[in-house]
Amino acid sequence: MTTLALNLAQYNDPITKGIIAQESLRRVRPDLKAVVNVNPYAIPTSAALVLEKLGIGTHPMSLAVHPHAPCKAIENQILNTVGHLLPKEQPVTFMAMKKSKLNMLRRHPSRADTFINPIYHPRDNVRYGLDPDPDQDASITASFLEVKTSTAFMQDTLHYLTPEDLLDIFETSPKLENLIASFVLPVEATRNMKSLYPDLYSIHYTHGGFQWAPSGHLGDAYFHEPWQLYWLRCGSLTRLIEEETTTTVQPPPGFEGEAYTRVRKEVRELKIYAERVTSIGAHHLFIFSRNAKATPRVRSYSQNGKWVTLPRIFRPVSHNVQTPLKQEVANSLMLYTYAVRPSLKDVAAKVRQKFDEKDLAEHSPLEITHLINYIYYIDQRAYLTNDDDILSDNLLKRWIFTPIQAAYKKAKGFLLGPDDFQKLLKALEWQPVTFDYAVDHYKSNPWRIHASRTGAKMRQLKNFLSRTTGLCEAVEDDALEGSELLKELEGNMWFRNPSEVEKEVFDAIVADLPPDSQRSELILEDPNSNARDYLPIQQDQPSVTQGPDEAAQTQTPTATSMVTNSVAARMPPPVPRTLREHHEQFPTTVRASFEQPSSTRAPETSENNTPAESVTPSPRAIYVGDFAIMDANASTSRASSPSPRRTVVSPRQPEAQNETLGRQIVSRVSPAHGCQMSPYAAQLAHQLSEQTAYTDVIGQRMVAFYSQHSRSYKYGRHEHRSQSWLPVIDSLQVALGLDESYDHCLIQRYRKHARVGLHADDEECYEPDSTIVTLNLYGNADFLIERNTDKASETITLQHNDMLFMPSGMQVTHRHAVCSLYEGRVSITFRNKTKDYLRKSAPDMNPVEQPGASAGQLTGPLDHRPEELPWEHWIPRLNRLGFTGLQKQTDPEGKLIYPITEIRQDMVYVPFPNCCPGPLRKDLEAMGRRPVRYTVDTGRALTLASDIKNNRVGALLQNADLTWKTLLVEYCRMEPTSVPMTVIHGAGGSGKSKLLQDHLNRAELNVVIIVPTRVLQQDWRNKMTEFPSFLVQTYEAAMMESAPQMVVFDDYGKLPHGYIDLFCQFHPSVEYVILTGDARQSTYYEYNSDAGIRNLPTNIEVFKQYCGYYINCTHRNKQDLANMLGVYSEKMGSTHFTFGNTCETGSLLLVPSGTQKTVMGEAGHKTETYAGCQGITADKVQIMIDHDTHKSADSHMYTALSRATEHIHFYNSIAGLNTARFHAKLNLTPYLKTFIQVITERAAAETEPAEYTVQAPTARTHIPVENCSTFLEKDLEEQRAKEDREVYTQAGATNVFQTNSPIVQCFQHQQPKDGALSIITHAKRLQYASAEANQAEYRAKLQIGAALWENFKTAMEIPDEPVPFIRDLWEQSEAEVLSTYLSKSEMAIKNGKNRQDPDWQDERMFVYLKAQWVTKASKFNLPTAKAGQTISAFKQAVVMKFGAMARYLRRITPKPDNIRINCEMQPQDISKWALGLDSHNRPTKQKWNFERPAFASDFEAFDQSQDGAMLHFEALWARHFNVPSSLIEEYLFLKMHAQAPKGYLTIMRLTGEGPTFDANTACSIAYNHTRYEIPKSCMQLYAGDDMLLDQVPVEKTGFKNIAAGLKLTAKTEIFEQKRGKWGEFCSWWMTPYGLVKDPITLYHRILLASEIGDLSKKIDAYAIEAEPAYALQGRLFDCFNEEQMTAHYGTIRRLIIEGKTNFSLDDQAPRHQDLQGILNCMDAKFMYH
């Protein structure tokens, strides 16, 4: 261990170790990246160790597998080395290499590199993805000829070539200076050895050659011939080349004579030197150079250890060890024989021990046998030398005896042979095996030429003449094979100069042409070009003295007019403009060819009266003229357009007509006239080509179709389904000046020679006057146009980036066809005026007809650009975002809205880091979003880290390990890091994230997206279906995980302050950061007042200085809504605004506070706060307006109002919307005030209340015998004395435990005359407050009341729309209340005359104690007296008025099937509902679930706890059903001004006020559904404050936020729903056989009534309550336990004793065997009912 490593090991602190580990990881990460680039595979350990020795690392965490991963890693390393050798700025020719491997060479595909990939083996078709070139010779070297770059690279193909092939390449490629070549040849094959690297590859010798199998996989093996091993020792290649030069010698001045031609032949030497660059295993990299001077004389290769060959000491020679042996093995075996005198078997065992299992397979049995014999042989020799030692020398011995002895030994050895020791020495003369070779210098036959080159040249020449002159037929690949011409030319070609052979081939082809078509001369423009560059020259050139008319009659163009002007081609392209501007800038004569009949056009000539020469631009725009007005017989100047390359003469047309055909059809304009496709448009077109997903294959072309209004495009038998419209298409249309009417975009990719026959593009989906625009993106193509009238035709050769415009009317007059001349040619075709577009698009989207525009002109939005736009120079960037930027829009105050704002000119940009992919880099740079250098603010980072460590912020981070948190803080104290950062600010829907999503969704990038909320996280995942979802992380999870090199922070303003600084400081792996956000929207807010980040500036404030500009545009909101917000929008239409007092379900609800979000969310609404909805887009949005709305910041309101795309519904949860105070509050919120002014109230849908049919129940009885004499014995023993149980007050003691009967004293008797009890009751039941305090409480609890109403509405399935008021139902409710009052006795009515006094104020009331015996089971035999119940006596008219309102709401409110309210119902009705019986007691499906515990809830002081929240809930309930507002206001006034004799009462429920029972029940439902998660499958029973559910609900997590605002205190109880433990509801038990009365409570009442003498008055009621249990007979034992059965027996016995003979157990009583029979009996007439 080194000193430094030893010192670092002394740090044992985990935090310090973590810091050291992070620093080490930071330093080693670039190395790991380089390792993965070369070797991304999972390599076996043994192979990984070998690769590491060879200089190739292996990533320990790699999981990628490959059949021969080690050799693949070596191949990548070779390519990596080649990448360092290739010139960076110059083009390179790549031979036999796939384009996908350019990334290993670190070369961008956009460079002008050339690929030559010959098809030699069949699998090359799959490897290169190309079909064989028809012009390619069968010989592999024929495709390598004519390399036009100075440097070339040939991958793993050199071993297939001979030295002559390589010389051919250099001879035919004079520009080629250096050829870098890699090949795979194992050097050990030169000695027939096994693999030197068996973990990397194996070698199998077979059929006179050998197979090289990477990783031992013969399925991937390559077969090599022995002669290919020559390349391992190739040093130079030499060839003598004979060149013939011809010079014309003129006679000297003054001498007569003729000039003569001198032919001189010279011989030059072509010498190529070869040098090895590197060798890794069997992979070698060589460089061949023509300008070198020498190469090393000896070349050595690695031998992976020391090897030796054993001497051949046995006869015959074949009986010796033939293959080399590792020297360490040989030495080991030799020393073994020295140490032990082994037997032959011992030697064999030792040999077996020295070879591994896998090595044994490499040796034949003969080899092993020979080795064993050799080792045994040396073992039998003498080990001790018999030579004299020099230490014993003396003078005599040295000079006399030693020479004599030496001569004797030599003679003896010569005659008798050597002794054993000499034999041993001979046997041990091992020869070391090395791979050192003297390089070989190859010399070639000087006149050799391949026959295949001759055949290829002949085909190239004939095919060229076929294309350029049409005077000979094209030749197929094998058409010339075996022809007589070829045989004649190949005669004696091995001894002839190659140039003479090629010339003879060319002359022979010309001789075969028709006599009248031969040219007198053919020249080659470039001596280094191939046969395609031969151009025909017309012998009869027009004279310079010809006039315009004569020049116009020239039929054949000159060579000069057909050669590209190199100077013009180098001119920079002009600024792109609209197509109309291009058209207007044409030269007058050129425009005349489009706009005037041919008879009126004037010819154009140059100054010397010669036809003006035209130049073919690249790229260029080709306009097809208006054919409908052409005069085929007109004769006009040829100068109006350049002549085409070829004119096809129709046999039916006169020659004169054919002369002007090309001029009339096609006009080309030079770049000087500005009519070319702009570089920006070309870039967009290429980007569109890269994004295109081809869906259909037709013949030899692939097709993709895009449209916004058409589902498909059909022609003939083919149909293409439309794909989603890409944003880049919009940008390309804008760049080309095309309007939105160009709705069809057809993209096609052609194979070479693919054809589309003559057609007119007149499908039914197009209008007859539609226009066609075609971009020829890649490659060349022949475009044929044929006139319908006379079948005259013309062919245009479309070149790279050409544009073709076919005007309206061409579908009627002409047809066209296309033939691809290039493999992979791509065309993009736009068509306008589709019928689907005209039918579906808005009128303002149609193309604008401009005055004076001809039929063929293209017009659109760009033709109506407003003048003097302040943002004129920003329009290209707006176009990339999908905006035209040509409209002037104003905000509500009339101010001009700028689409680009907050422009900064002081930005200092830095280069993009390498981790940013090229396409994304280009788009960001084009949008002006280049990165800036940002240095982390460690102070901000440390503040957030401290808050995280001390659990002041975050939820997930609070559970992190303390060590990790401490490490987080320590990182913030280190030196700050700096990262390149791109900040993108824009309005919601501006597309600031769309660019990133488009790139990330189609590329595998090392990037993570960090978002502030889960809602935004899901939004990203939904939009990027191809992107791994786990890479979209919330900010807390991202902080705890490792980070990639590139990080995107979306909506970064909602991240905690300092988060970005902390993230970059804690993750040093981050190399590039992209921030997207909106400076106008809400930002992060920390609720913890102790958090340090509360005092930090927001992220927006910190990073907005690094944003170049703000995109104040939106695609989300329609123009009216966007303009109200001060945002630019081109989305037409009107946003729908509505207003109401109810919250609708199904759409996003935005609320002002987090409490409201929790409450409304638990009520079933999809809810977000104003500030928390950032990043969400929805068609419809609801915005809640309450008393917290005006407290919201403008940024919060802006965020909320900008979410909707179609509809905003304002939900008012405040009473008195139209009050002046409310409007004053709205003035505090300017955004909302703008919207409220444009809203009208909606009408509610009408609903009819449901009607209920009430059936009268009856009962029968039955009971077995039980003993109940001691039933109350235990209770009576525990009973205290009366004096100890009464309560004493200033008015004396209470008197609730009366008489001396112990049974009676178990029950409290509460009476109004008990003054002491009245004092206790009033103190507990009544609370006093002022009217102002009640109003303040009501306002403070509006939110809670709204939450109660929303949950009640959800539970009762009340429609969202307000229900109209039903007058008839109201009057019926009033009549029922009046009838109930009048049904009282005259005495009762007379006693209430004071309450009927009209002068009695409505809010005044009397309060007195309710008289009752307390028989409730929970209050049986209490140790002390408890407070009683109060009765509030309001004015009778008030009670009847609000009683009618309560009855109306009860009738009109829907009642879902899972909820039953015990009002106007009998126990049998509830039993039928719970057990699923129909009206005829037939079982259907049981609803109540008895397989799980039941749940009951009661309340402590329920009436007194119904405060302002419950009152607001009642008001919302009444308002939703359109109860007259005056009545609602009166009810609110009464509740807040209720006045008892001692003063105003607080807001509470008062028994006797009218709606007591209905309001209590509704408040109970609302409270329980607000507090608990109660599913629809849960059956529920309610009656006042009593409630029973058939399952135990789960409390909502958000209830704790509003629990403190409620006075209600619930008492819950869980029932197991087993024997004796059934759910209790209003003293009834829910059993599997229906409701039965609690037998103990019923028996207590009977005992009390019997003791006080009231049993005879109440016996009928008790009998009815006992009947359901009595009817169960034997099933009663399934319901009651022992104690309960005793109580039931006592009840039945007492009823029988009191004369209820129907309860006797006679045999005539019905025996019910099933549930249906039980209830049928219960429904029968009962005599006591």
From Swiss-Prot:
Coiled coil segments of this chain: none
Originating organism: Lolium latent virus (isolate Lolium/USA/US1/-) (LoLV)
Residue ranges occupied by any (+)RNA virus helicase C-terminal domain in the UniProt entry: 1112-1247
Reactions performed catalytically: RNA(n) + a ribonucleoside 5'-triphosphate = RNA(n+1) + diphosphate; ATP + H2O = ADP + phosphate + H(+)
Function: RNA replication. The central part of this protein possibly functions as an ATP-binding helicase.
Bias type Polar residues, positions: 538-567, 586-617
Its EC number(s): 2.7.7.48, 3.6.4.13
Name the UniProt record assigns to this protein: RNA-directed RNA polymerase
Obligatory cofactor(s): Fe(2+)
